[in-house]
Structure formats: structure tokens, C-alpha cells
């Protein structure tokens, strides 16, 4: 992998939001279930990323090749008082042009390292049932809890299930 993985900071948020907009658009155009049915416009995608970065409960990483964003992943800390040890993993995306270069595991590795060093011991996520992402998570040691049928409308208009997964993270 030639991409550098870095955590988004307040100082880099605006430029990163603009850089990640094409990644979100490409991910939706490729049919992935990431909360959008139609691809957002560049402006909508940029504003969506900016709003995510403004949420104090989130930490986001971006993989870059120079100024070009190739992929991303976000950690969302649990808001409940009984969950300071856990977080949700959302929006692992890699642009189609950059897939197969080890970017997704590098992003997940950065997130897991951060989680462990910050006292988080349990990560959870949901992913489209039967997707490539589900098989990657399984390969990376994530455990399947179960599934929910007809959970989300896909970009094609079909209802698709989601699989709930978790991973225990050792404290650093």
C-alpha cells in the first residue's frame, strides 16, 4: 500500500470533507449500502462529511495518496453511560480505483489501534449481509451476532439484510 493513513483533525476537516466526497459518491454508485439510495452531489457529500467531523463522538481516518483520498473509516463512541468501553465502526469505504491495495485493512488497523490505546475494548458494526465487506470483517476476526432481514433499501431499490458483528480489542 502506498497510501498514508491519518486521523482527521479539526485543522484538516474542511479539506478532508471535500477530498472524501468523491469516495462517498463512488461507494454509493458501486451499490454499497452506506445509508444513501441515490449518490449525493459533490456539495451534499462534502457537507455530510463536514457534519460527521463536527460530531465530538466520532474519530475518522482517511487513506491518502498525495492529496487524493482513497478510503476512510469512522469510529463512533457509545453515547450511553454504560458503554464507555465500546464504539461502533461505520463507513469503511475504499474508492473502486484503489481497492486491492491493502487500504481497508490499514484503515481498520489504525482504528483498532486507536480504540485499544483509548481504553475501548469492544467494537460493533453492521454490514450488508452477503457483501464483500462481511467476508472481510470475518477474515479480520470479527464475530457474527446475527442478522436482520429487509433492513435497508439498496441503491437498486431492493431490500437487503444487515449482519451485526463485534470484535474485542485488547488494551494497548
Tell where the protein language model's regions lie, with residue ranges.
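Glycine-rich phosphate-binding loop
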Residues: 98-101
